[in-house]
Amino acid sequence: MPLLLDTGALYALADADDDWHVRVRDFLKAERQLLLVPVTVIPEAAYLMRKRLGAAVETRFAETLAAGEIAIENLTRRDIARCAELLNTYDFLGYVDASVVAIAERLKLRALVTTDRRDFARVRPIHIAAFQLLP
């Protein structure tokens, strides 16, 4: 089953000084599953990388995506409608996180690779009781 990555996990992977860096890096090295990133996560992660780590890190991220090392998952119209439902239900959830949830629900994924324990732990997906938050 594929692993869906959110912004925090991608950022932690890029920033060796991030508190989550070693955990995310080691977890992803050990996994042999397809890595997926929602298309909505890309600009958010790229922005944070450029702002905090510099243009070279953002460029490496773009090169990684272009090389296909991480697959990109697009939103469907149903996903966008589900995002609206999630935003209506959870006032703490932003659009990018809602898109992560919507894609995970559509793909029937049970786990998310994320550093955001606070928000994703509070969401109740439609296909399971709760997401397993990795690493």
Where are these regions (language model features)?
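Active-site neighborhoods of divalent-metal-dependent phosphate/nucleic-acid chemistry enzymes
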Residues: I70-T115
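Histidine- and aromatic-rich ligand-binding microenvironments
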Residues: L3-D6, V37-V39, L93-Y95, D116, ...
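Short acidic, glycine/proline-enriched helix-loop-strand junctions
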Residues: A62-L65, E69-T76, A81, T89-Y90, ...
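Acidic, PIN/NYN-like endoribonuclease modules and their adjacent C-terminal/linker elements
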Residues: M1, V101, E105-P135
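Short, well-structured N-terminal submotif of metal-dependent ribonuclease cores
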Residues: M1-V37, R50-E63, I126-H127
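Alpha-helix/helix-capping structural signal
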Residues: G8-A9, T40, R78, R118
